[in-house]
């Protein structure tokens, strides 16, 4: 069996891709070269139709592996607000009706929570990461608890970062959009999920 040299990160979202790459690079996976969907021959990508983040992440990783033959890691993530029964959940990216409309999604969520008192504004960012290779399928979940702010703050990140105030030491009540990339990478839901996935990735990097 040939040495695995490429790991396909199954994403076209450049901001998410940059974050995933930073976390994986910081882990020192020297046996793997990261490539994205922008680096491979285009293929039909299945819609995100799963009932859970895990369903969607696994479907994306399976599709990418089947189309390219490269070991593939995929992420599906979103925001779960307790006052909305865990929504927007898997609908996070299209909560306002248009996929990827961060401003619209954020504005709608704030409007839906406008009368919710501070003590009931708990929420969590959730990331499911799936790894599919010729010998293995692994799915993990990372959760980053926090609360929903009453208005957007900060200009970094993407998605709901400007209204999510994460729990964590030394974060000082800032939203994710106000954190430095290194701070986000050290606490985020994707970091937590990828940390759980790291043993499988290290095996992949060493496999011959």
From Swiss-Prot:
Keywords: Hydrolase, Magnesium, Metal-binding, Nucleotide metabolism, Nucleotide-binding. Homodimer. This is dITP/XTP pyrophosphatase. Belongs to the HAM1 NTPase family. One of its GO terms (molecular function) is metal ion binding. Pyrophosphatase that catalyzes the hydrolysis of nucleoside triphosphates to their monophosphate derivatives, with a high preference for the non-canonical purine nucleotides XTP (xanthosine triphosphate), dITP (deoxyinosine triphosphate) and ITP. Seems to function as a house-cleaning enzyme that removes non-canonical purine nucleotides from the nucleotide pool, thus preventing their incorporation into DNA/RNA and avoiding chromosomal lesions. Its cofactor is Mg(2+). HAMAP family: Non_canon_purine_NTPase (MF_01405).
